[in-house]
UniProtKB/Swiss-Prot annotation:
Source organism per UniProt: Burkholderia pseudomallei (strain K96243)
One GO molecular-function entry: S-adenosylmethionine:tRNA ribosyltransferase-isomerase activity
Known function: Transfers and isomerizes the ribose moiety from AdoMet to the 7-aminomethyl group of 7-deazaguanine (preQ1-tRNA) to give epoxyqueuosine (oQ-tRNA).
Official protein name in the record: S-adenosylmethionine:tRNA ribosyltransferase-isomerase
Gene: queA
Catalyzed chemical reaction(s): 7-aminomethyl-7-carbaguanosine(34) in tRNA + S-adenosyl-L-methionine = epoxyqueuosine(34) in tRNA + adenine + L-methionine + 2 H(+)
PANTHER family on file: S-ADENOSYLMETHIONINE:TRNA RIBOSYLTRANSFERASE-ISOMERASE
Amino acid sequence: MLTLSDFDFDLPPELIAQTALPERSASRLLEVDNTNPSAPPRLVDRRFAELPACVAPGDLLVFNDTKVLKARFFGRKASGGKIEVLIERVTGERTALAQIRASKSPPPGTTLTLADAFDVTVGERVEPFFTLHFPDDCLVLIERHGRLPLPPYIEHAPDAADETRYQTVFAANPGAVAAPTAGLHFDDAVLTALEARGVERATLTLHVGAGTFQPVRVENLAEHRMHSESYELTDALVEKIAATRARGGRVIAVGTTSMRALEAAARDAQAAGRPLAATRAETDIFITPGYRFRVVDRLVTNFHLPKSTLLMLVSAFAGIETIRAAYRHAIDARYRFFSYGDAMLLTRRDDAAEATHGGA
């Protein structure tokens, strides 16, 4: 049985990308060809702008169109004590769930002043979050007064460049507190080239929560509990997936968030004895080696943190030894890692079930 230690690796800190490159598609792309089970994976160093040449006419790229909220606030209690608030999820026009850092947890009814601009009232506790009641439309106040919540491994304060580059060019539905980072590499030129090649596009929405950065703290992976995120698949997406299958094309998830939404919906549909359909739901799906993929054939993804659930996901998809070889190559070749880093193109290995604790 695989354990947390199986997903550890040493990463030189200078390979953690601190800023985005000047051009989105100037990032590097490691194409991983692992389709021959009797041979080591073939690793091809490319530029991301070459992605259209790596996919086929009739394939379908599925993007996550979530938009990152300016979800971080600094503020104070009525006593003057300093607080930090990170919005986790907008739950209504004037309500949201949030993490609150303070010297003492604020009880219900507490008034907090955020960004020296407006007051919110603390409502009920929904572990591990607090309900916040806003005086007006939360999305408007968040966009106007909040700060972009860059990942904890990015060391600079967010600036104007981040406000553009930590969003995808197709972001449309506000609600995430972290970017679907595989999508950050796509610019208009790449999207136009994909269209010219006859590659289809579709979107879904999964609002990425702050839990995406939470470390796994248990050695036995079966004991880990994933955070929950909301997602939505539309009729148009489901129809495009069916049409892609009918013509022999491949479904390519852009990012692990797209992957998780597609696979969660397909797993739940199968459990209910029905075909994949449009849905709006919550998922805490935890994909580890042994998981049987139902929808996704290929995956565009960034390089992930050691011991992270996302590293486990890509290992389940492509095979743990394939991922180890690819990461060793990426480190030796000085690829850039994490949110502002470079990308990989992976192909599903149906024999990648090298452990069985991932479940069906």
